[in-house]
Amino acid sequence: MSELRDTRLEKANTLEQLGQGPYALTFDPSHRMAELQADHADLPNGEERELSVAVAGRVMTRRVMGKLAFFTLADETGTIQLFLEKAGLEAQQEGWFKQITSLVDAGDWLGVSGTLRRTDRGELSVKVRDWRMLSKSLQPLPDKWHGLADVEKRYRQRYLDLIVSPQSRETFRRRALLVSGIRRWLDERQFLEIETPVLQSEAGGADARPFITHHNTLDLPLYLRIATELHLKRLVVGGFERVYELGRIFRNEGMSTRHNPEFTSVEVYQAYSDYIGMMELTEAMIAEVCQQVCGGTRIHYQGTDIDLTPPWRRATMHELVEEATGLNFEAFTTRAQAAEAMEAAGLEVPGAADSVGRLLNEAFEQRVEASLIQPTFVTDYPIEISPLARKHRSKPGLVERFELFIVGRETANAFSELIDPVDQRQRLEAQQARKAAGDLEAQGLDEDFVHALEVGMPPTGGLGIGIDRLVMLLTDSPSIRDVIAFPLMRPESRPDEAPSVG
């Protein structure tokens, strides 16, 4: 590899001496590859079109056959063949054919101008009459046909993955369409996107362990946000009736095919709405964005057909658990009763689940969650695990909350928001007690947030959607790392360790 780099560096120096500086400032393409392919699909085989074009891109392949050479040039939209004829290039400038065939390698960025021709084999080509080195590559490309077989390398060096994998490029193109589609959908309905702090003095809005940092000038410990909820609710208190933020969230937790410590979510708050209104908003928005990104609301994910056409199934957590286990948690009045019934049904009973409501949630996670393949709104959660949600209007011990599950994964979470400041303080104090007892994911008491509620917050529906998981679904990607351009990775090796394997 070092020898190859040295050889390419010598070529770069030679180009410099020839006045073809290997790193150009600008180039002005007249067309993109896909545009040329579409506009000149009618050009017959073996014919030329006297249209002057200029294209730029990365050289992906090169074949030199005596007095002819064929390069494949790729830009963001597609590829086109470069037809290089010694006689034509030498007529423009002596030595040009030799220079381009000996000094240009696969991986180099090249700008060319010429006319169009279609080869006898039907390949639309630019017959090159002028060329310019735009950027000399000193490293070889991965194998064009096999791509990056090392999955870890795909994530660590995403730029290589994008060069050789059209599928990866399409994934991130769809991600961009999805993000812009969500913003457009909300903007068109008079929602305002307002940025909230990433650095916060209190980590709240979710049960999660935060990243901790320090502000040197203020000598102040700070947290990277684990949610945008509490600040967006402050904005509702301040009079913004429809507000959202789409951005990065940080949680100091484990990594898996579903979890990355840095991820993207959108949180949406609508005054005068509730969790039922948020269900309607969620299914309408996701269905429309899916239509824009995928061309329809029926998609294929990892061998399973998924129908995102509204309306979606709605079922309570109690109903789903009883359906899956035969256990009616509404009949249990003590934790001991629920625990005994769970053990008899073959369910695990974690000691940390210290109430009937927490055990209900455990039963749901163990027996129900993975089976929810088609989009399902799971509603009416235990109050113990929902400290920011409003008490249910007719079901004691529950809150007005739903989570959306698709292909067995939580994709969205929403509430009728808790706006009673006295109730909110009591619940956050209970959370603070759990935190003091060692629960690292429990929320603290944000006094300013409670004060904001005391100023007065209108009835509000709130929603959070995991963008990365939604992108996974719409791109048929099995891992969250496939849809995050640069996911956090374990170090390949540390100075005091042998290199890791796998």
Curated annotation (Swiss-Prot):
It comes from Synechococcus sp. (strain CC9902). Binds 3 Mg(2+) ions per subunit. Gene3D superfamilies: Bira Bifunctional Protein, Domain 2, Nucleic acid-binding proteins. Keywords: Aminoacyl-tRNA synthetase, ATP-binding, Cytoplasm, Ligase, Magnesium, Metal-binding, Nucleotide-binding, Protein biosynthesis. Belongs to the class-II aminoacyl-tRNA synthetase family. Mg(2+) 2 binds at E410. Its cofactor is Mg(2+). Pfam families: tRNA-synt_2, tRNA_anti-codon. It is an enzyme of class 6 (ligase). One of its GO terms (molecular function) is tRNA binding. One of its GO terms (cellular component) is cytosol. Homodimer. This is Lysine--tRNA ligase. It comes from the Bacteria. One of its GO terms (biological process) is lysyl-tRNA aminoacylation. SUPFAM superfamilies: Class II aaRS and biotin synthetases (SSF55681), Nucleic acid-binding proteins (SSF50249).
